[in-house]
């Protein structure tokens, strides 16, 4: 036995086979059914020549079959490649070739894109197609018949292969890979040992005291002894946080509610229908429309006792609304990245200091470093780059240059340093400021977009915002904002900044604003800064303020 995703899930199968593991409207899987389907699919992968360490792509929205595919890949000791279902052809080509993908499991609605990219991915030899809820018309079948004919039907792979669990012993050293979102460059595959990722994302370390959990049966035993927890991971499974919400549910005999699309009112209907206990979201992109939906219509949310956000900005003004609406629930804001895993969390209270980004209690292996690699002491007001030691990734897949830049050794200690800047608060907590690669250098001052975005969203008419730097003859760059407002409102930039200046210094406030209908974000809710820069370059600002000679 090993600290391995497939092993943990199998423990739950053995203790609770008749429990429902996965559920959506009109369909479900018990643990026994999940086990049988995943075993059969894993045998199909082996029949296609997949060996331990080979890469298998999953190109799907959140579906029951997507979860079965992930579990099957781990059972076969292969390495899963998470494929963003919103990628255009050039992005798909990059991830197919960069990952050296040998098999792709995809939803039929993506056939046209797969057909166009397949000739450019020489190592991708086999396809397994999942039927989806998008109609399959005759024209599409004729147009892409050469591809669909070569693809194995997902249902056939399950029906025509052994459902026995007769795989070789797995290892702590089996690999888990997570491709980054690519919001600041090409997506990169972050390669982890399974034991390491278990320690930081799979519950293998107590997040409050740092004590390792070494009993591999603990989650299954605890689950079998207690009631069933119902989790609803809303973000796409291309996002690591959402994957791990499902895996942890399956480790402990819980039930994961699975839906392919996000809708604010739909979310609360699902919560009500499935009596959801824990909701997983990614920041304001989901939190704002969800809380607005609750203000528009009353839903039964009495089953909810926790709402957890990760991977994207969760503004304090929005958190306050959740605390008001869910006074007895735990509202959690967690930080981390593909390169670090869990970095810290905070239980939200109303009226917390708004300055900066998320403020969390860091885990024991997270520190702040200066540029020379020395550790900033707790209590210092210096801004440093966040770094994690202990259980961290091995490397980026196929990118030794980037690996050397991110995974560094200082004074004999190996760190993962993805580039997020932060500072300590007087109580030892860490306030996140943002990714250095998108920071704005204005007159020698480094300004982090996330803390400005949070301040802008405190204005009642601002629904969403992305902050970028634009060229400025005097200061090099000036802070600018692309803003989506509520209900067609058009607040003045002066009024927006008046609210923002209650949380951030004046020199951090935007001097120009571009209004748009919606802010483009990744499926995981992260802002697309390249898109924001493109908006500022495509047309004149809707409003620009004069820059004073004295900045405060």
Task: Give residue spans per PLM region.
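Conserved pre-ATP/AMP-binding loop-to-beta segment of ANL
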Residues: 152, 159-179, 186, 222-230
